[in-house]
Structures are given as C-alpha cells and as structure tokens.
Amino acid sequence: MTEDFTPNAGYIEVKPPARPRQNIAKDNQQMRLALLRVKRYETAVQRLQEEQDRERQTARQAGRDLIKYTTSVKDHAVPELWGYLPPEKNPYALYEEENKTTGCCVIS
C-alpha cells in the first residue's frame, strides 16, 4: 500500500518553482517600501483632516475681535490714550525706588 503513493506509481511530484534569494530579497524590499509609502500617505491624510476640522474665523470677525480687545483693555504703554499709572500701582516705579544707587558699582 505504501508503494501506491510513491512517485513512480503514477503520481507526479510537483515542486514549487525555485526562486533565487535575490528575487525574494528584492520582493521583500519592494513590499517594505510600499508599506512605508502607504504609512506616509495615511499620516498626510490625517494631518490634512485635522487641519480641515480646525475651527476657522473670517477676516471680518478677526478684525472685530481685535478692535474690541484694543478698545476694552487698558494699555498704559500708550499714556496719551489711557493716561499714566499712579506710582503706587506701577511695579516698575517701586522697583526703581528700592534699587536707587549713586551710580557707582563695586566689582569684587
């Protein structure tokens, strides 16, 4: 009975085609490059989707917000518009009074 399954009993032995190692390595390299390319495309699509989902503001609304901010927030760096700070509220004036020197320094 074991003789029936031998190749000389009418069965044809089929072997896979022999592929050289170079072809296998080349195919593997091409597969890796294709996977890297797909990964780059996926990350680019994800970044574009995030950018598209970001909330947008029109130029008109941005201008209105800027005007509203500049007219409502006091900026004492422009004293012609908002006036000078009283000395007790000016932290830089207090700092200058504490650190008054005669103009000489000693380096040791």
Curated annotation (Swiss-Prot):
It is found in: Membrane. GO terms for cellular component: heterotrimeric G-protein complex. Keywords: Lipoprotein, Membrane, Methylation, Palmitate, Prenylation, Transducer. The lineage of its organism: Eukaryota, Fungi, Dikarya, Ascomycota, Saccharomycotina. G proteins are composed of 3 units, alpha, beta and gamma. One of its GO terms (molecular function) is G-protein beta-subunit binding. Belongs to the G protein gamma family. It comes from Yarrowia lipolytica (strain CLIB 122 / E 150) (Yeast). The keyword Membrane applies. The keyword Lipoprotein applies. The modification Cysteine methyl ester is found at C105. A lipid is attached at C105 (S-farnesyl cysteine). Residues 106-108 form a propeptide. Gene3D superfamilies: Transducin (heterotrimeric G protein), gamma chain. This is Guanine nucleotide-binding protein subunit gamma.
